[in-house]
Amino acid sequence: MAEAATGFLEQLKSCIVWSWTYLWTVWFFIVLFLVYILRVPLKINDNLSTVSMFLNTLTPKFYVALTGTSSLISGLILIFEWWYFRKYGTSFIEQVSVSHLRPLLGGVDNNSSNNSNSSNGDSDSNRQSVSECKVWRNPLNLFRGAEYNRYTWVTGREPLTYYDMNLSAQDHQTFFTCDSDHLRPADAIMQKAWRERNPQARISAAHEALEINEIRSRVEVPLIASSTIWEIKLLPKCATAYILLAEEEATTIAEAEKLFKQALKAGDGCYRRSQQLQHHGSQYEAQHRRDTNVLVYIKRRLAMCARRLGRTREAVKMMRDLMKEFPLLSMFNIHENLLEALLELQAYADVQAVLAKYDDISLPKSATICYTAALLKARAVSDKFSPEAASRRGLSTAEMNAVEAIHRAVEFNPHVPKYLLEMKSLILPPEHILKRGDSEAIAYAFFHLAHWKRVEGALNLLHCTWEGTFRMIPYPLEKGHLFYPYPICTETADRELLPSFHEVSVYPKKELPFFILFTAGLCSFTAMLALLTHQFPELMGVFAKAMSDIFCSAEFRDWNCKSIFMRVEDELEIPPAPQSQHFQN
């Protein structure tokens, strides 16, 4: 019964929609016919005469007040529309018209929409999963104590947001802890330290973990089987405590490097011991996974310290060795550190070799990969590139490849060119970035701006060609050219990652709908007329009379000119030529 009732209601609704869509003229004439028949019982003539009498008795002040009230209501609607547009990025009236009025007028077929939703469900879910805004660890992140804190001491501004630091705390708990940490006192202390919000409390906990390891303890390990001779050993050093001190307490890169070297000595020993025991159970396997993450992190940060201190070749060697030793750990994105160091050495052939390995369609892209590929192709033609010459003779094959590479990079992250061309000021990059977002653009430009400046003409080529990308993707939120559509959620995530004193770059820029602009103009013009009429009624009356006379005279002049032209055409009409005498009979 319920299904039958539902089907009957759907049929009734479809009939009503069909009647409103195709038979609106019939409905209109039916209404007029009913009004004509019921004109006597409804006393329409008397009501019309009463209304006309009421309107004739109204004074000009009433119309002024009515105009002012309508202007006030229009202004309130405009303010609400502007607020709704700033918050949600769309017009409220347009959304209501499309979402509610259009289905009532028969613009949407429920059956077809359901079928399309069921058939395209997989593609929609894939689109959502791809466009989901995932936050990534910045592979080129700075040191808190030696770089971020020094910036705070000088400027008084906090370069990191609470959301960014909270993500870092979650990363540290994921990389540097495991379920068996409670069995070792130092690791148990560090497990609590990574959750601590106060920096001084974290540093104190790291010192406490190191002090525990200074106590000599008797480890019951027989030197000889079935022997009563015991060896006295020192507890292994806590590598994660050294990591925390190097990241947050060290005020210079040199101090951080010393602490990381001590962490490397402790972490390497723990890694070798857990490597031998990893197959003895899930607990040992988790410890080995944790020790591997700790060792990779320490070596990567040591390479970054060498890069900061000017030992670039040493840093490149350390990064290459680390990538060979742990090829499966791609979550640290060490290849991006390697690309930046190779660009500093101007080893462009090695950079091309790294790009050939990582610039693959199956791997996730980044601004570093896309813009480095564009830089290499621009380097081949940028020194001889001239916009005037290119407009005359056209682009060569190499120039076309460079322009296409720039368009590809700009489509992936459209925020980078403004920082490379110094149209926007740079800030310290955050510890986490959003791919294709403003945070990734800042992180890339902060380290790679010098490499673009070093290549002669590269920034000039970028300046001349980067805006051409937007003509290829007129609707970037709906359809991309080489990549997926640009995600909508980048602005919100970037505002969480970047400090409040930075103006977040928004793409694509939200433009005010025509309805809001038209309402604003009409409201302002009507309010101005009402105010002038109230203040200067006689002058506005003269002005209105003059405008009506002008329009009437203009219409009369147009009609008079047309009549004159018609008379002239009639008078200038050429009569037919007489026949020649040679053809008369």
From Swiss-Prot:
GO terms for cellular component: membrane
Subcellular location(s) of the protein: Membrane
Positions carrying Phosphoserine: S386
Principal subcellular localization: membrane
Membrane topology classification: Multi-pass membrane protein
Assigned keywords, A-Z: Glycoprotein, Membrane, Phosphoprotein, Transmembrane, Transmembrane helix
Glycosylation sites: N47
Parts of the chain that traverse the membrane: 15-35, 62-82, 512-532
Listed PANTHER family: SUPPRESSION OF TUMORIGENICITY 7, SUPPRESSOR OF TUMORIGENICITY 7 PROTEIN
Entry's family note: Belongs to the ST7 family.
Protein name per UniProt: Suppressor of tumorigenicity 7 protein
Taxonomic path: Eukaryota, Metazoa, Chordata, Craniata, Vertebrata
